[in-house]
């Protein structure tokens, strides 16, 4: 699938001391040559594979106002990117953890959808071996570990302004303060909560199976069906469609799954992004804490794994051979 770059600009923020971030602005746009296209394709791939949160612009968002003017042809893309980088520097300066980086703005098209991607990338040093087998220093953009990135679906934003999912951003690993400063710069707030939608789906599936009075084996088969469909959508980069999922579960009950969720008021969207970590709960139980990590297939509950809620005790019958071997060696050694 081809990625077509419309316009791309790079600027830089350099941290000179604890108080100041120096602004270095390009005087021209980047030429979208083969190297630039390859870089953007890699950034698009890395970003698309990561878990994202969804948002929308606030009414007073300066970035949204400037972007709207740029899209209407009242401002050049380069001028838009330069002004936005200045606002980013001002926002970053409020935080003691502020670091510099390469600031990227790229307007591109992928699969007939227009996007604006904004990222702060680290420019790192490394070593390479040249053709004479000498070691030389080199610099590279750390795209694989990019975590300050947001992407606006311009097509969705302009055709469906009431949407709560046209803006996506990375959330989690970078920490709340970093996420907060970037959201402040974007002038955005969280919109669709994909995790909540997936949790609601899991609850609806269990309730649907219970309403159909399925036995344990049948309930687990339903969960497996749902997981298989959702995982297929996830791998294809597609959203979970309630109507399609309902067709997958046809025959489970006289009432369709889509009808059941609507009647019971689960407030599920007609389509929403799949969340990998939440969906795993359909087929596995997992948890960790206090030096203990446990992970087992859901079908084993009640067969080899038993939980007593009164005493909060988990009993496992038949330990994995490698674990049993470790336990035997440790206990036989008297330690």
From Swiss-Prot:
Disulfide bond positions: none
Q: Which HAMAP family match?
A: NdpA
> Which PANTHER family does the entry link to?
NUCLEOID-ASSOCIATED PROTEIN YEJK (PTHR38772:SF1), PTHR38772
Main location as per UniProt: cytoplasm
Its keywords, alphabetically, are: Cytoplasm
Q: Which family does it belong to?
A: Belongs to the YejK family.
GO CC, any one term: bacterial nucleoid
Instruction: Please list which residues make up the signal peptide.
Output: none
Q: Which Pfam families does the entry link to?
A: NA37
Instruction: Note the NCBIfam families from the entry.
Output: PRK00378.1
The protein's name? Nucleoid-associated protein KPN78578_25800
- Native source species: Klebsiella pneumoniae subsp. pneumoniae (strain ATCC 700721 / MGH 78578)
Give the domain of life: Bacteria
Show the GO MF annotations: double-stranded DNA binding; single-stranded RNA binding
Where does it reside? Cytoplasm, Nucleoid
């Amino acid at each position: 699938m081809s990625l077509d770059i419309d316009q791309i600009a790079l600027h830089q923020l350099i941290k000179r001391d604890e108080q100041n971030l120096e602004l270095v602005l390009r005087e021209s746009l980047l030429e979208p040559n083969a190297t630039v296209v390859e870089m953007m394709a890699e950034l698009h791939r890395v970003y698309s594979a990561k878990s994202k949160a969804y948002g929308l612009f606030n009414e007073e968002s300066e970035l949204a106002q400037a972007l709207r003017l740029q899209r209407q042809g009242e401002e050049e893309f380069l001028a838009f990117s330069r002004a936005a980088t200045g606002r980013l520097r001002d926002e970053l300066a409020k935080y003691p953890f502020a670091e510099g980086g390469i600031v990227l703005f790229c307007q591109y098209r992928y699969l007939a959808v227009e996007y604006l991607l904004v990222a702060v990338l680290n420019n790192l040093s490394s070593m390479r071996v040249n053709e004479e087998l000498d070691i030389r220093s080199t610099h590279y953009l750390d795209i694989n570990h990019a975590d300050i990135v947001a992407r606006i679906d311009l097509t969705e934003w302009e055709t469906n302004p009431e949407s709560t999912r046209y803006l996506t951003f990375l959330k989690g690993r970078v920490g709340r303060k970093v996420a907060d400063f970037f959201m402040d710069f974007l002038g955005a707030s969280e919109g669709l909560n994909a995790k909540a939608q997936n949790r609601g789906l899991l609850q609806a599936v269990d309730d649907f199976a219970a309403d159909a009075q399925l036995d344990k084996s049948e309930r687990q088969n339903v969960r497996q069906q749902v997981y298989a469909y959702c995982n297929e959508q996830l791998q294809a980069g597609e959203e979970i469609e309630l109507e399609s999922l309902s067709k997958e579960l046809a025959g489970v009950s006289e009432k369709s799954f889509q009808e059941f969720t609507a009647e019971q008021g689960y407030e599920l969207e007609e389509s929403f992004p799949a969340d990998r970590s939440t969906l795993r709960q359909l087929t596995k139980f997992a948890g960790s804490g206090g030096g203990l990590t446990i992970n087992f297939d859901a079908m084993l509950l009640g067969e080899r794994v038993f939980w007593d809620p009164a005493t909060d005790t988990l009993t496992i019958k038949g330990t994995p051979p490698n674990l049993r071997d470790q336990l035997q060696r440790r206990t036989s050694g008297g330690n």
